[in-house]
């Protein structure tokens, strides 16, 4: 999470947040990171009056980007080792595990056992979900994406979102709306390179029909909120480098 004198940014992983962070740190001198992937409910009261910015991504695309970002880089971390069953599961199996997080109590218990009781959000590359936080997914039937969305943002009606597929335009629109845009910021946003990308083919090529349908079930609330759909590669640009 980054706080400025104009707004607060809550960073949802794999949604273009590194790009947004770079813009904020470059153009807002008062900006400071107060916790890496810090949930909004932990926002200090002195910043509670500020507008909150977040970012979202098509859930089908999120799981592909997330998998190819954390594996094999974070193969030994608690979440990744749990997702991949110690490296024995590849994308389909790992994603199925993530989607069934709120329905498979035995596997949920195994993951909770690996997580800390408390999180020091000043640290990076550590488990940033507590045992108590993850307990809340039990019996909900939602997938990992929806769990993280709810955990980070809480009441999403109180948050302005940049959609990853139109990140630059949405970011400029938000900054204009709060009176924090300038010609220099607009030019920088439009001309800067992507950040923290994961190398993969179009997301649809990784899914079986059954797995794609499971995403639509487990992450239905977010999908319907933002109007996301599953697009085959033939109807979308084959982007090999997505943030």
Residue ranges and their predicted role:
Residues 1-243:
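Membrane-interface amphipathic segments in extracytoplasmic regions
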């Amino acid at each position: 999470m980054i706080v400025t004198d104009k707004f607060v940014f809550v960073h949802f992983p794999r949604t273009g947040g590194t790009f947004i962070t770079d813009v904020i740190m470059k153009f807002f001198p008062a900006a400071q990171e107060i916790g890496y992937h810090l949930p909004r409910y932990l926002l200090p009261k002195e910043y509670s009056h500020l507008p909150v910015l977040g970012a979202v991504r098509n859930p089908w695309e999120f799981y592909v980007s997330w998998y190819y970002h954390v594996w094999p880089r974070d193969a030994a971390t608690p979440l990744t080792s749990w997702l991949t069953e110690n490296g024995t599961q590849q994308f389909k199996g790992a994603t199925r595990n993530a989607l069934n997080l709120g329905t498979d109590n035995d596997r949920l218990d195994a993951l909770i056992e690996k997580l800390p009781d408390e999180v020091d959000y000043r640290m990076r590359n550590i488990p940033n979900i507590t045992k108590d936080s993850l307990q809340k997914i039990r019996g909900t039937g939602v997938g990992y994406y929806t769990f993280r969305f709810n955990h980070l943002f809480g009441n999403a009606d109180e948050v302005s979102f940049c959609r990853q597929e139109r990140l630059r335009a949405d970011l400029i629109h938000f900054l204009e709306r709060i009176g924090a845009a300038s010609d220099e910021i607009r030019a920088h946003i439009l001309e800067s390179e992507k950040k923290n990308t994961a190398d993969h083919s179009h997301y649809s090529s990784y899914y079986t029909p059954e797995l794609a349908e499971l995403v639509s079930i487990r992450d239905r609330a977010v999908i319907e909120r933002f109007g996301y759909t599953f697009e085959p590669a033939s109807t979308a640009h084959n982007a090999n480098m997505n943030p």
